[in-house]
């Protein structure tokens, strides 16, 4: 193994609320694959909700910024390494809040006044990154390939990015820091590096409905139905996504959609990190966390390793 392939990069890891419940399989598989691809994840101490949902309920912009500021102040206390998260909503909200604090002197002052109540302060010097971008720019597909011991040969994967993961880059970097917004390729590249076959998927950045599923479920069902129809038409064995809410919505609403529209969808929806964990030969449950998926993929389960 070359010196480059042994290189390890350290990050402050922000798991986010979904990692404690609906997206435990994302968190567990990310932690499992990180050392395999040279990433050291130091969990953020005493982290709180990013505010993607509750932070917008009332009180204006400050409560939301203060939630972001508190996390980043704690991260600053752990060192100057970049902050990384695997959750699209956490990333979008924390990235946006961080940029606001960095560029708006008045906002930064108000945030630090709020943080002072907890003896905290944030300088605005940290960078917030999404795990997918880190894998693209710090790891690369060649390193992923070098760790594959159990190639996912014959597994057809529809890469569903969702609408949030690449959005801040599209807004602030003139089209994307690591990929384009309209036609991102990174999930396809990840799947191919693992030995799987990416399939054409024209709705890869369509919205799944997000939290609208709570307020207006009928609208969400139509959005998800389109995603499932495209995946089925492409012959996908599984749908791969980086987003906890996308994974939950597209997986959990299939039964409801089948009953409402007379369809027969039963398409497994997994996180890209679960595919990597299987390809790296990690334990199917302790590494890939396949036991946490509601819809099982017989094909992927058959490829996964079970270790004592």
Listing of model-derived features with the role each one plays in the protein:
Residues 1-308:
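Iron-sulfur cluster-binding electron-transfer modules in prokaryotic oxidoreductases
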């Amino acid at each position: 193994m070359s010196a480059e392939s042994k290189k390890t990069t350290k990050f402050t890891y922000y798991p986010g609320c979904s990692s404690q419940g609906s997206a435990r399989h994302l968190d567990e598989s990310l932690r499992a694959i990180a050392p395999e691809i040279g990433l050291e994840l130091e969990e953020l101490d005493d982290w709180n909700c990013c505010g993607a949902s509750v932070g917008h309920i009332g009180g204006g912009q400050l409560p939301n910024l203060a939630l972001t500021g508190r996390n980043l102040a704690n991260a600053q206390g752990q060192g100057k390494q970049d902050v990384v998260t695997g959750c699209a909503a956490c990333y979008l909200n924390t990235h946006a809040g961080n940029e606001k604090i960095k560029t708006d002197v008045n906002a930064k002052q108000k945030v630090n006044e709020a943080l002072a109540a907890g003896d905290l302060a944030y300088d605005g010097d940290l960078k917030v990154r999404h795990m997918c971008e880190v894998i693209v720019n710090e790891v690369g597909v060649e390193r992923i390939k070098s760790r594959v011991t159990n190639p996912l040969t014959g597994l057809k994967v529809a890469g569903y990015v969702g609408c949030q993961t690449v959005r801040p880059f599209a807004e602030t970097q003139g089209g994307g820091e690591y990929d384009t917004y309209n036609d991102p390729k990174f999930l396809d590249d990840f799947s191919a590096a693992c030995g799987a076959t990416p399939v054409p998927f024209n709705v890869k950045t369509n919205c799944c409905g997000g939290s609208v599923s709570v307020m207006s479920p009928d609208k969400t069902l139509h959005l998800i139905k389109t995603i499932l129809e495209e995946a089925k038409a492409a012959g996908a064995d599984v749908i791969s996504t980086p987003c906890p809410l996308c994974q939950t919505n597209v997986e959990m609403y299939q039964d409801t959609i089948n009953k409402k529209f007379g369809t027969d969808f039963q398409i497994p929806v997994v996180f890209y990190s679960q595919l990597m964990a299987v390809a790296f030969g990690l334990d199917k449950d302790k590494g890939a966390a396949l036991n946490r998926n509601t819809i099982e993929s017989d094909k992927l389960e058959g490829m996964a390793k079970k270790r004592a």
